[in-house]
């Protein structure tokens, strides 16, 4: 129930942000690796909200999949990030962003920080705090959190429209 309250809060927050004028939204899909007291593969979808290239907001939903205590497990994850780069008028300086965010699952909440290269490749780390006594296959999901993600903007797959 607490997990649902967090999802509703973040949804209202980002809907309110989207209601502001001139905000661009870019959908993405992503895949990656996460270490959280076990090894997980991750796949999901992500939306980027931006007014300019200096501050980007991302919200995503994904599934963590891996073996925990010898049993296959799938763990839903909701995530919110802010990407920052305040370099002005220098395109190559926008090749990296500092990233801060939080991910939440039914078992843990994990604040994190890291770097994003071109907004495509993310490296993050943080610390996960267990929510209540929730465990995954009898294993506590708290402690060091490491993440590597590759983002694929869906605009890559859209057909270009040419004026005739």
Q: Would you name each region that the model predicts?
A:
Residues 25-35, 55-67, 92-107, 123-131:
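Transmembrane beta-strand segments that form the barrel wall of outer-membrane beta-barrel proteins
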Residues 37-39, 67-71, 86-88, 108-110, ...:
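Gram-negative outer-membrane beta-barrel proteins
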Residues 80, 141-164:
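Outer-membrane beta-barrel "beta-signal"
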Residues 19-52:
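Short glycine/proline- and aromatic-enriched beta-strand/turn motifs that initiate or cap beta-hairpins
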């Amino acid at each position: 129930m607490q997990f649902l309250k967090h999802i509703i809060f973040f949804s209202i927050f980002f809907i309110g942000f989207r209601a502001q004028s001139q905000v661009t939204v870019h959908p993405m899909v992503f895949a990656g690796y996460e270490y959280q007291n076990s090894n997980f593969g991750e796949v999901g979808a992500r939306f980027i909200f931006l007014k300019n290239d200096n501050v980007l907001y991302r919200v995503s939903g994904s599934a963590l999949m891996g073996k925990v205590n010898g049993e296959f497990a799938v763990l839903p994850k909701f995530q919110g990030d802010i990407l920052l780069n305040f370099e002005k008028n220098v395109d190559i300086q926008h090749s990296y962003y500092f990233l801060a965010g939080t991910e939440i699952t039914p078992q843990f909440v994990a604040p994190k920080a890291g770097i994003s290269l071109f907004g495509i490749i993310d490296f993050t780390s943080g610390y996960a705090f267990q929510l209540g006594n929730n465990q995954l296959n009898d294993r506590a999901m708290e402690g060091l959190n490491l993440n590597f993600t590759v983002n694929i903007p869906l605009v890559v797959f859209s057909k270009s429209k040419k004026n005739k």
